[in-house]
């Protein structure tokens, strides 16, 4: 089994963890239906940028 030779420093640990942070999802509110959705995605109703794009 691999065993480290030297203890990694706080700096190296921090550099490794620098990409581990989570980002919040960018949400938008549709101007017609008022529904919350992900940016650049359609709403559950089928609206995108105030227009009905999926008709059921």
Swiss-Prot record:
Tell me if Zinc is a UniProt keyword of this record.
Answer: no
From the UniProt annotation, give the residues forming the signal peptide: none
Keyword Ribosomal protein among record annotations: yes
- One matching Pfam family is Ribosomal_L32p
Alphabetized, the UniProt keywords read: Ribonucleoprotein, Ribosomal protein
Checking InterPro entries in the record gives: Ribosomal_bL32, Ribosomal_bL32_bact, Ribosomal_zn-bd
Output one GO BP term.
translation
- Superkingdom in the source lineage: Bacteria
Q: Which GO terms describe its molecular function?
A: structural constituent of ribosome
Q: Where is this region: Disordered?
A: 1-26
GO CC terms on record? Answer: large ribosomal subunit
UniProt similarity note: Belongs to the bacterial ribosomal protein bL32 family.
Stored HAMAP family: Ribosomal_bL32
PANTHER family the UniProt entry points to: 50S RIBOSOMAL PROTEIN L32, LARGE RIBOSOMAL SUBUNIT PROTEIN BL32
This protein's name: Large ribosomal subunit protein bL32
Q: What is the lineage of its organism?
A: Bacteria, Pseudomonadati, Pseudomonadota, Gammaproteobacteria, Enterobacterales
């Amino acid at each position: 089994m691999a065993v480290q030779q030297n203890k990694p420093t706080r700096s190296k640990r921090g550099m490794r963890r620098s990409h581990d942070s989570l980002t919040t999802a960018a949400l938008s509110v549709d101007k017609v239906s008022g529904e919350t959705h992900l940016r650049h995605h359609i709403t559950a109703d089928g609206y995108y940028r105030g227009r009905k794009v999926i008709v059921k």
